[in-house]
Amino acid sequence: MSKKVLVFGGTGYQGGSVVRELLKDDSFKVITLSRNPESEKCKELKKLGADVIKCDESQPKEEIEKVMKGCDCVYLVTNSQGYCEKEIEYGIKVADVALKCGVKHFIFSTVPGPNKLSNGKFKSPDLDNKVEIEQHIRQLSKSNPEFISSFVIAPWYFQNFINYYQPEKESSTSDKYILKWACDPKVSLDYGDIDELGLLVREIFKNPIKFSGETVPFSSEILTPIQIVEIISKVTNKKVSYQFIDPVEYGKSYDLEVSLMLAFFNEYGGFNIYGGDRSIAHNIKKLTSFEEYLKKINYKLD
């Protein structure tokens, strides 16, 4: 008998990967939520076999409960952008409804929390909010052992270097490029093709007892910014250099939330601070490297 899985954020990077991967397996029936079920992304998911229902985590408990009744499993990824202080409220609400509805296995996409790990030296709402939600879910499982919870940590997406952190030309007439970012050039962080996250989530859903209470990191490669520009140079056959921008200045000119994250990671590093076994994802399937990803999408610098 197939497990009925409710996936939040099915039109986003993480949720979309989870939906697509679960739909490849006949042992899962997938439902996902959207504020606009008639969007092109939702239509694509419907074609693959997903049920798309008009709802999201901002809806009242009663509405979420209607959708969640009868579900065996839930995958929750929360969104700080647009919600901010509401993210914690929404995440806790979804977990509480899942317990009430008899959900057997709940997977939450969490992150290392700067405020907790640095004893208040660093703070990042985008990261710290998720830690509070994780702690609430863990307490629910502790008080209700039949409510199994597991956690995944997503890395910095390879996709970010296509959509957000693009190398720029040194000048309008130059054939040389610069990647400007706030990650210390000597700091190694975890990266991956987020389209492959669903592989790991499917494995966890298939083995609830094994992964009960576990935090499992998804990481294809551990790279420094210098290694990143070297790979971009190799694939594009263009000269790409790296320019470190202090996180404080980066936050003023580019992206405040990213600057807060990187200020923390520059001092504390990647997933090592959180623990967890990176090899689990690698043992499921050979994961795509950054070089392979760029070649796969035919990445170019114009």
UniProtKB/Swiss-Prot annotation:
Cellular compartments per GO CC: nucleus
Keywords associated with the record: NADP
Disulphide linkage map: none
Binding site for NADP(+): 9-14, 35-39, 56-57, 78-80, 130, 157-160
Matches recorded under CDD domains: NmrA_like_SDR_a
Gene3D superfamilies recorded: NAD(P)-binding Rossmann-like Domain, UDP-galactose 4-epimerase, domain 1
Matching Pfam families: NmrA
Protein family: Belongs to the NmrA-type oxidoreductase family.
Protein purpose: May be a redox sensor protein.
Record's protein name: NmrA-like family domain-containing protein DDB_G0286605
Provenance organism: Dictyostelium discoideum (Social amoeba)
